[in-house]
Amino acid sequence: MKLRGVSLAAGLFLLALSLWGQPAEAAACYGCSPGSKCDCSGIKGEKGERGFPGLEGHPGLPGFPGPEGPPGPRGQKGDDGIPGPPGPKGIRGPPGLPGFPGTPGLPGMPGHDGAPGPQGIPGCNGTKGERGFPGSPGFPGLQGPPGPPGIPGMKGEPGSIIMSSLPGPKGNPGYPGPPGIQGLPGPTGIPGPIGPPGPPGLMGPPGPPGLPGPKGNMGLNFQGPKGEKGEQGLQGPPGPPGQISEQKRPIDVEFQKGDQGLPGDRGPPGPPGIRGPPGPPGGEKGEKGEQGEPGKRGKPGKDGENGQPGIPGLPGDPGYPGEPGRDGEKGQKGDTGPPGPPGLVIPRPGTGITIGEKGNIGLPGLPGEKGERGFPGIQGPPGLPGPPGAAVMGPPGPPGFPGERGQKGDEGPPGISIPGPPGLDGQPGAPGLPGPPGPAGPHIPPSDEICEPGPPGPPGSPGDKGLQGEQGVKGDKGDTCFNCIGTGISGPPGQPGLPGLPGPPGSLGFPGQKGEKGQAGATGPKGLPGIPGAPGAPGFPGSKGEPGDILTFPGMKGDKGELGSPGAPGLPGLPGTPGQDGLPGLPGPKGEPGGITFKGERGPPGNPGLPGLPGNIGPMGPPGFGPPGPVGEKGIQGVAGNPGQPGIPGPKGDPGQTITQPGKPGLPGNPGRDGDVGLPGDPGLPGQPGLPGIPGSKGEPGIPGIGLPGPPGPKGFPGIPGPPGAPGTPGRIGLEGPPGPPGFPGPKGEPGFALPGPPGPPGLPGFKGALGPKGDRGFPGPPGPPGRTGLDGLPGPKGDVGPNGQPGPMGPPGLPGIGVQGPPGPPGIPGPIGQPGLHGIPGEKGDPGPPGLDVPGPPGERGSPGIPGAPGPIGPPGSPGLPGKAGASGFPGTKGEMGMMGPPGPPGPLGIPGRSGVPGLKGDDGLQGQPGLPGPTGEKGSKGEPGLPGPPGPMDPNLLGSKGEKGEPGLPGIPGVSGPKGYQGLPGDPGQPGLSGQPGLPGPPGPKGNPGLPGQPGLIGPPGLKGTIGDMGFPGPQGVEGPPGPSGVPGQPGSPGLPGQKGDKGDPGISSIGLPGLPGPKGEPGLPGYPGNPGIKGSVGDPGLPGLPGTPGAKGQPGLPGFPGTPGPPGPKGISGPPGNPGLPGEPGPVGGGGHPGQPGPPGEKGKPGQDGIPGPAGQKGEPGQPGFGNPGPPGLPGLSGQKGDGGLPGIPGNPGLPGPKGEPGFHGFPGVQGPPGPPGSPGPALEGPKGNPGPQGPPGRPGLPGPEGPPGLPGNGGIKGEKGNPGQPGLPGLPGLKGDQGPPGLQGNPGRPGLNGMKGDPGLPGVPGFPGMKGPSGVPGSAGPEGEPGLIGPPGPPGLPGPSGQSIIIKGDAGPPGIPGQPGLKGLPGPQGPQGLPGPTGPPGDPGRNGLPGFDGAGGRKGDPGLPGQPGTRGLDGPPGPDGLQGPPGPPGTSSVAHGFLITRHSQTTDAPQCPQGTLQVYEGFSLLYVQGNKRAHGQDLGTAGSCLRRFSTMPFMFCNINNVCNFASRNDYSYWLSTPEPMPMSMQPLKGQSIQPFISRCAVCEAPAVVIAVHSQTIQIPHCPQGWDSLWIGYSFMMHTSAGAEGSGQALASPGSCLEEFRSAPFIECHGRGTCNYYANSYSFWLATVDVSDMFSKPQSETLKAGDLRTRISRCQVCMKRT
């Protein structure tokens, strides 16, 4: 608006200058009489040099308001407003073109589990291949015949068990299964017979007695070693006397071998006796006794270690089906086996399926979610007639073909003309017919000195009204009058004129463009009923109707019957309630063709008669033969007329086609009372159709009954015309009138500002140019006049429901419907009308439901548009209908909102040139008008093709011939060869002016003239103002690759930017081990810890020094009674005994201090650029930078000629220079850039001189020398932005400038070389899907079109050839401190691409790139190698305090310490909540959450923290939100993963739902510990010891990491208690989904810390596959320890 105000002010200032300067010019002609010879014009001098800018003038008067400006740029997004009331539903816009293909949608919900594939043939254990993508589980195959024993394959997936009543064939021997759960001891069996004695075993050497071992650790979950020997039992009762060999000699005792006695029961232990003296030495060892009888069955011993697998035994008898075993580890992928034979279907015996009766109809459920779009169903039978639609006229259909000429209608009564309020002044009208010849004016002798014309005279008296002339040719559109001076006061309305004589019939025009939709007219009174027409032929199937309401009555429940044959038609039902007025009836039949009237010869003109009455509408003329004419301008909206009298019904017409236009939905009516329900009658025999009855008077509205809707009633007679309506609203401003006759040239004005002038007149059509580039989308043109009604098109698809129509008149009351009296329901709130749903497939016949309440249900969601059905058959074309009478004009509609800019449509075909109209008579010249104010800048005119110059016309010096009739455009000639330019001719003498002839009477239309020669090219219009920024266009096609631009001078360094956001998580780096850092400095000694509880006994240490003599041991078991020996003398001292037992382990040394911090490692590689983000709003234009300090580079090569710039603002006018002598013609110079248009020249003589012959061509001139540089002018206002020039040639490289501010992101370059795999990035925000451009078809190459706008900057060219290698090797210096930010340098030209230098040192990480658009989902990557163990994470924040736990047992008295607590979480991996360890307090208990996965990204919980123990379980515990303040829950393909229990999966392997999930979810407890808790891992199968001063809380297995869907997952910090699970399972977690199901899947993996032998630490790990039963032999053990307080 500011710009418009400036241009207005400048225009008014110019006007003031021109008015003020007129007396000076008039003085040059002072005293000239009309007959004298004054030379007032002077000799026109050469065009002077542009003067210096003049002083700024005074501000002008305020200008008139300018035309409405173009739409401004989109403003910034405002704050959210208060939600307004719901507005009325807008008018449905026309359907848009099909959009571009959208970006691929987000992944859908996972499909149902596929059927398992057949079991493959076990292959050999191959070498471990690359990890493949996880396959889907196959179906279990049938048991095949036993093959020859192959090499044992890897363990397969557990197969399904098919229960069969018959015993199967004998199976192959299985591998040893894992040990089962220990059963209850069975009853004692009958002792079996004594077996034969086995062969004697080899005698083993007796082993030395071992030392007593230390007490072992807590046992493992699997079979441990045999326990220690128990304590001495009580003394048993005395046994039966044994057979003792006689004593032969007192000393030389010899025992004879006795028989084996029966084992006695164990007696109670006797009291310990007093230690006796040492007994005499016993006798010699007797012989080994014979094998005793087997004793009773002992107690079950502890489980031994797993033995080695034995040799496969012979096949045993088939066993009973075992319990399902635990899931084994997933084996390696075997080779693909050959396809197996087709399996047999083994039905399960004894399970017949009986189909029960159909249940009662249920209560209506809640509206379901919107389903997926289904496939189109098969074509159903035609539905019942739908209820009558609202009587609202739909939008006009497409123009049909012209119908045959109809009969002339009867003359209607004259309408009542209600004058409206006076409209605004219209544009100047077309010139009227010439009046009678006026008196001759004064004769002006021919002379070369013509004075300026005098002031305009008074208006003349109006002439007599002439005859109505033929329709003249439509004139060119006149120039738009911007800033017209003066607003006339509207005059009073004139008297209505007398009717004119009937005009001759016009020729048939072609359909124009569709006009704007008018407002709906006022509803007329109800018409009389019309005579019913004869039934039409059956039409084609209409579009699918709305589903009708189904009212059913309760009956007895029957079985579903077979489909019966069609019954006879029933008796006519009772009359239904009258429907709303129906759509207009079918058109009548084709009438007889009328006679063709020919136009008679034109008679001599008679005297003007009084205007006659308006004639009847003439018969339609014969169709024209020419091609369609151009689109006409939109007509003025007329005032609504009164409805006409009813016409006589036409005779029967051929059946027409019905196009159903959906009307607007009506307002909801008030609910009526329930009617009495009658019993349904039996169907009667079909009766004959009765005659139509006389319409009854309008009754009171009846009570609506419950019943099926009746068929639509017959169309009523047209109604009696209503009273005249109220005066209409004032009409719109009329069309722009044709241009007036040209005035005489005005006096020379002051040099104006070089504002752009209006565009020149259009030239004659040039030769057809080649198809130019596709232009920008223009603003919508004015609507054309309404086209003629076309033939009915084929039925279109059913449209969406339109807006509500006006309520129709109240119909007569209907008869009471039949129905059962329902109970009165509570009044419901009427819901809005829902969208019509698709027809479903007919379901089974349901039981009749109870009658529903008359309450509209809640609106359903709008369904997805269905897939287009198969096209119906094309029906035969209907006969053309009679032309309808002109309807009353509707009220002007409100202008619709400007629609969104549509995508560019395809270029339409070239139209056929129209026939020329009858030439109009030339009008008289008008009086000279005042010069208008300069108009605003027009739109930039398109450059016209130059026409061929015409030859000079014959010249009569006395008479100036009148303008000849415009001939038909000639066919385009073949372009001639370009000849050499002729020499410049001398200017000819001006010719004598001719006398003005009197205008003749209108002649008859002349014959068709010969084609005229092409006219002179029009003047080049000034450039228009820069248009406003349009809406974002769709992506254009790929431009032609532009030439590489010149290199820019490096800018100055900018200020240090703000720290960037956190970069994306990189991909895993190349697995290499970084250099270890230097040891850090020793830390300060810590505070002394709290004394801990006694630790578990340590493992066996190295042999210690000989211990002190031990204390006397416990009494041994009593030996056999010895015989007393003789006491011997004391012997000498014996030799030293063996070393004693190892001593207790020593105290561990103090903890060392922390090391020095290591040096930082080398910087990592630069991460890959992130995905494109959502495009931000357009940034504000930056301020211009300061001039740089760089030295100017050498001058670049001359650039190509730039495109024409826009005209600048005028400078201050300078003093006029003296006219110099005209120089000789120079040599032909290079073409210069076209300058702005010059000021208008002085007026020439008022008479047209003859056109001179073209002069001979002058020799080409030499280029002139460049003039000296002038002084700089005053700074002008900011010019309008010129068009973007073409890129120049590359200049020489400039000096490097300082680094500039960070610019906006550039266009995406060509892809570089593939970088190394970066680390995996965090997920980017999802980008907005772009519109992918569709590649258009290649056009036919045409001849060169006019010069197009410069194209968009092409993508960067390919890299140039490598230049010579550089010389200096850059060595990275130490980074200096950041300097003061310099001024930004001017952007230099880009230099040519230099050679590839040597690789420099790794630079610092770059600025984060903008998020890219989301790419398409790539294929799943291969699983990477496990990364190095990460550093333990920092401890998380303490959670909020939970509710008080149960009262714990009283703790031991603690030492005084500062009160502090640490939260840990213990997971039971069962359905029972775990107990908190001793010394901790329970905070709360919950369910064990392992990790969640959303938007294909996983986020894990540390199982040792409280965050992994959610107090409530849900298969989808989270939801996701976006930037639009919208959150979605359980509506996407997201997952949650929970620790699971040992509960086996059901045999069907179906996903778990509902309450069946609960047994599979592990429970957990959050405990508060008084000190820090850590986990220690042994990396062996031995349980590690807690550090000294720490107490054990629990032991377990070292759980490290887990992955599942999409190879996503998370892991545990090995220092956290969450990395030490108390139970090992190969599948320790279960996957749950947002749809409420959980299941185990084959792509779920758990990762456990493995055992490492000390000797194998730095050698290559050996591949190994462990089967079930051996899994725990390679899994590291761990212990969770708490610091002793």
UniProtKB/Swiss-Prot annotation:
Ranges where the record places region Disordered: 49-1459
Designated name of the protein: Collagen alpha-5(IV) chain
Reported impact of G653R: In ATS1; juvenile type
Signal peptide: 1-26
Region annotation (Triple-helical region) ranges: 42-1456
SS bond list: C1476-C1567, C1509-C1564, C1521-C1527, C1586-C1681, C1620-C1678, C1632-C1638
Collagen IV NC1 domain segment(s): 1461-1685
Effect of G772D: In ATS1; juvenile type
GO biological process: collagen-activated tyrosine kinase receptor signaling pathway; neuromuscular junction development
Highest taxon of source: Eukaryota
Mutagenesis / variant outcome for changing G811V: In ATS1; juvenile type
Chain's gene name: COL4A5
